[in-house]
Every structure is written in structure tokens, then in C-alpha cells.
Amino acid sequence: MHKKILPNAKRPLLFGHRGVSSLAPENTIASFKKVVELGIPGVELDVHLTKTGELVVIHDSSIKRTGRIYENGKIIEAPDLKVEDLSWEELQKYDFGIWFSKEYEGEKLPLLYDVLKLLGSDIYVDIEIKIDNLKYKGVVEKTYQVLTDILKILPENPQRFLVSSFNPFAIRYFSKICSDIPTALIYDNHPDNLFFLKKGRGLLFCRPDILKPSYKCFTKKKDKESWCWTVDDKEEAAALIKKGVTGIISNRPQDLN
């Protein structure tokens, strides 16, 4: 059965992409604090599972792009290591803020639980599960566990969460183990996308340049929503909303709020 997506949220809904990633390093506590400080109504973030089973907030499967480490008194780029191959303890050796600016030196990779605790119960959260293969059950089950745990300590506004993924199988599995939290399928060119949408797997996320008329007509017919990322321009956001898009994900939500 199709679930209303974030039913208490006003439309169009604005999300900060990986926090406020234009002002602070993406997917860090500093970036999520900006969401709170600026009064952004929603936030999108990404999760990966570590080798030791923790759910951490990071976009890439590797720590190379945003991770830094000190070696012989110098700051160097982290090696091309996958999050899934590193323990939580090993990940603590790396700095995930200084790549953005010296101001954010010392930012560590945050746990999803800690981020959700910081955001509280008033901010809407889109949790994107990052998994590009069939080993999705572990990260899906851990996501469900963390959401269950956070709702025990912050039970207000329980319909503030959304789980999304490019992986349609992960979305199907999450819907199977958790019927209370809505899901979203992020559109690329996966041949099974339309099938999963027809089966009620939530709303549709897509980039503005691939907002296909066929998908737009389908979602409207099925009373589903379409949200777009990444939109940083006011005029583009207004044009998309005019087309029927009800959610905007932006690196610069402070300019669109």
C-alpha cells in the first residue's frame, strides 16, 4: 500500500543535500548543525555500514575524497579504502573536515544515530542507503534498527523519516521489514525502476535533467510524488515546482529557504 510521504510536511519541501554542504563539509556534524541553525526544514544524508557493523554517514563508498590523515606532520589524502572494509576504530584516525577548510579540522565521520539525535524531531530526514550490489540486507536492517532506537528517545513526529536508495532491491527489502516508514526510489536507468514504483515502493527521486515525461505522468496518475536533486538555483527550483515537483534537494538550501 502506498504511504503518504512525510504527511506533516508542507509542500514544496526543501532538503539540505548532505547537510548544508555549501557552507560546511558534507555529511559531518558541522554540516548538520547548519541545518538546525538556519531552520532548513529537511535534510538528505547518506549511510554506509562499517566492517564492525556501525552505520556511518558518508556519501562515497571510499574515504579517499573527503578523508585526510596526518603523516610526518603533514595532512595527506586518505588512501582509497572502502568504508565496509574498515572498523569504526580505524575510521576514527581520519579527519573529514579539513579537506573543506581549516576551520573544520577535526571533524570525524559521524554515526547515523548521533546525527539523528542532533537533528531532533522537527527536521525531516531522507536517509539514502548507499549499496550498489546484492549485499543490501545488512545495511537495510541496521538502518531500521537505528530508526527504531532513535524513535524510542525522540518519539515526537514519528513520520519525519524517509528511506531512499538507487538500489530497488534495498527499497523492496526495507518496505518488507518496515511498513511504517515510507521509501523513495532514486531514478537512474535501472530497468526495474518502473516495476518497483508500480508495486508501491514510494516516491521518485531524479535529477532535473532526467525528469522524463513518462515518469512524471506515471507518478501523477498513481498519486506519487517526484522530488529533484541537486537544485541550487532559485529560478530552476521555481520551474520544477511549476512542473509538479514537490521536493527540492539543494547544496544551497540557505538561498532557497
Segments the model singles out, each with a brief description of its role:
Residues M1-N257:
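Phosphate-group recognition and catalysis centered on beta-loop-alpha active-site segments
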